[in-house]
Every structure is written in C-alpha cells, then in structure tokens.
C-alpha cells in the first residue's frame, strides 16, 4: 500500500529536500565554466535531459537566456537525428539526470565528445557515483532526496531541487556579469515583467 501524506507533510518534505542540498558542491567550478565558455569565449550554454528532468533543463535554458546568458535546450533524442549539429566547439553543456544513468543522455555525451572532445559538461544529479558523473567535468548533487510521491517514483522533490540548483546558477551568473534592469528590458519586452523592467531603468542602472 502506498504511503499517504498530509498537505503539511508534503510541504515539509519539499522544504527538507531544499535544506539538505549539499553545501560542498563545486558551484564555483560550474559558474566559472559558464562564465569562461559563454561570456568570455562567445559560446553558448546548452541544457539537456529526458522526461521531467528535460523539462527542468528547458526552463533553466530559457531563464538563462532572458538574463543575459545565451542558452538553449537540446533534446537528447533529437540530437541523434541531426540536432547535434547545433552544438559548437566553444559551448558548455548542462545535463540533468536524477539517476545519472539515463541512456539517451549518456549517448549524447558520447556523440558530442566524438565531435568536440574537449567540450565541458556540468551535471545535476542525485547519484554522484553514476556513469554520467564519471564522464562530466563538474557534478552538482541534489542530495538525492526521497520523492514525496506516495509511490516513491514520480519526480517531485527531486525536480524541486533541480529547479533550485538551476536558479542558483542563473542568479550567480547574473551577479557576476552585472546584469541590469536595462539589460533585462531589452530581452523581455512583453508583458508585466517587460513593463516593470522598463519602469525600473534609471540613469543609475545603465546597460553594461
């Protein structure tokens, strides 16, 4: 029989998962790779993952793009049908796989390295000793929190932590590059956020 959670227990489990994100992850190495490859080298950040992890990867890419770091999502399966040609030698790739064993993502690494042997990879995973961890340059652990799903299977707490680790990278890079309200308004013209960013532009918040 599956476990039954109260609303309070679900919220507590999600909060605890965030509290137990490892503090000793090499965040600085991941941030430095993005800065050196994208902002200094002119490459792009490519994110990738399958299933729910892939949806998180897509969100991270769009958030990076809107905040001054050119990024896009590459579907691991579509990469095998021509989309791998979107990758350039100066890029850096951010992979997300909770198990660290996702076949399509492992194949993506192998195929990319066949084209560009020195292209660096960052991995967000719940399994530090996984096959993917052995292949990448930087591993960021989620702490492998138990899923709050009553079956213990559906990605729930794990995807919460993946999202937060993505936010950590985005915000850290924004701060390093000095991203301003004006910069934001140029990339996000429409909607409430576009209006708000333009309202906040002042002589003290110029573009870089």
Roles of regions detected by a PLM:
Residues 12, 16-23, 39, 69, ...:
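Generic secondary-structure signature for well-ordered alpha-helical cores
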Residues 3-6, 10, 22, 52, ...:
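Catalytic cores of large soluble enzymes that bind and process phosphate-bearing ligands
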Residues 134, 148, 175-207:
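Internal, active-site/partner-interface "lid" segment
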Residues 1-43:
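An N-terminal, well-structured beta->alpha segment
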Residues 35, 44-177:
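Glycine-rich phosphate-binding loops that contact phosphosugars or nucleotide phosphates
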Residues 38-49, 66, 195-206:
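Short, charged low-complexity intrinsically disordered segments located at boundaries
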């Amino acid at each position: 029989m599956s476990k039954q959670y109260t609303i309070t227990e679900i919220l507590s489990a999600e909060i605890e998962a965030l509290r137990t994100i490892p503090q000793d992850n090499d965040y600085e190495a991941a941030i430095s790779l993005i800065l050196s490859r994208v902002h200094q080298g002119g490459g792009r950040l490519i994110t990738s993952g399958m299933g729910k992890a892939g949806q998180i990867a897509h969100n991270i890419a769009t958030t990076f793009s809107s905040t001054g770091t050119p990024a896009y999502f590459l579907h691991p399966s579509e990469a095998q049908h021509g989309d791998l040609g979107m990758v350039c030698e100066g890029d850096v790739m951010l992979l997300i796989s909770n198990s660290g064993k996702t076949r399509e993502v492992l194949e993506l690494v192998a195929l990319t390295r066949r084209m560009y042997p020195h292209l660096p990879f960052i991995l967000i995973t719940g399994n530090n000793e996984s096959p993917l961890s052995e292949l990448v340059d930087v591993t960021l652990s989620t702490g492998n929190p138990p899923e709050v799903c009553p079956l213990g299977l559906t990605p729930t707490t794990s995807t919460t932590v993946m999202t937060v680790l993505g936010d950590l990278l985005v915000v850290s890079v924004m701060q390093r590059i000095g991203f301003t309200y004006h910069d934001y308004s140029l990339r996000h013209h429409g909607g409430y956020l576009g209006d708000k960013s333009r309202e906040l532009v002042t002589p003290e918040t110029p573009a870089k």
